[in-house]
Amino acid sequence: MEELLIALAKGLVEDKDSVKVTVDEPAEDGTIVYHLNVAPGDMGRVIGKQGRIAKAIRTVMRASASMRSEKVMVEID
């Protein structure tokens, strides 16, 4: 899952070396939180107009997680 998020983000940003993902321990309800960190200059590319790109990233991650019977949440920092 972490590799999928990194691949999605690196496809959008200019500074590919700045893409970092940290993972929190699963919460009580089993939700795994992924924190996506990108360079400040690339933040707009990852979020997109009205958050459309961010929403698409979250949708792809949720779909992939549901195939594994997992719950995920993506936060963009």
Model-derived features: where do they sit?
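RNA-contacting regions in translation and RNA-metabolism proteins
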Residues: 1-45, 55-77
